[in-house]
Amino acid sequence: MAYFPGLNLLFIHVPKTAGNTVTSELIQYEPAQPPTKILLPGMDGLNRFELKDGFSEKKHANLRAYQATMPADLFKELTVVFVYRNPVDRLVSFFYSPHRSAERGDRVLGLREFFHLLRRHPTLDDYLGLDTPPFPRQLISLRFRSLDSDWTLLASRLGLGQVGSLPQYNASSVQGVRKTWPIFWLAMLATRHRLDFAYRLGCGFQTGLSSRRRLWPRKRLRL
């Protein structure tokens, strides 16, 4: 989503993983020229914006988009950061996101609708997978469930000094579907989204579903 040159950091904004929160904080600590923040007042929710960094024009750009536009010597030295959120919670949160209220109406998320989300929603591998070199220097995952503490660790690693707690923007609850969560989990395991769980387990992120996707060698750090 955004390149921070002074930090030598690329943040990939996976939807519904507190990306607005993290990028808002990173902008404050960027010692060089930060990405341009463009507010989106026409959208539902608070503090919705896009960032323009000269390499991608999309808020939720994937890693391949940056690989295609960045000089190779710059790309291969990057620290790539993303937030890992339980894949089921992430999709459920997307369904109930404030900006989808008109499309959703008063519908409650059921199994059929969840399968529809699985078919059209990108996987983590879609956002982070690479087929060919160059590859970034390292990949760091922040855990959504412990984002404050992981953010503090990342700030320490980047030499940002003492940082405060993260604010929360545009949260959508997943509590209303907790009873059906096991069914959604099984549904996800039946699709390509099952590979998202490997990012939490640190299993190498290999898809096993496509001969085109190959594991890109990287140093993965879990904070």
Predicted features and spans:
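Membrane-interface amphipathic segments in extracytoplasmic regions
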Residues: 1-223
